[in-house]
Amino acid sequence: MNKLYRSEKNKKIAGVIGGLAEYFNWDASLLRVITVILAIMTSVLPVLLIYIIWIFIVPSERDMK
């Protein structure tokens, strides 16, 4: 079973989106575009807060080994 973690290989900022993409076996670039569109539609703050919270809650790939 896959574990959710922040990706070390597929990251731009903290690896949150890359980790989600690896967990669900999705394309990380597409997920990043969807995240940006969602952020624009919700005035950025909610998505930014969720992203920051996930940085602290979801362990990094390095911690999972």
UniProtKB/Swiss-Prot annotation:
Keywords: Cell membrane, Membrane, Transmembrane, Transmembrane helix. Disulfide bonds: none annotated. Signal peptide: none annotated. It is a single-pass membrane protein. The chain crosses the membrane at residues 37-57. InterPro entries: Phageshock_PspC_N, PspC. This is Uncharacterized membrane protein YvlC. It comes from Bacillus subtilis (strain 168). The gene is yvlC.
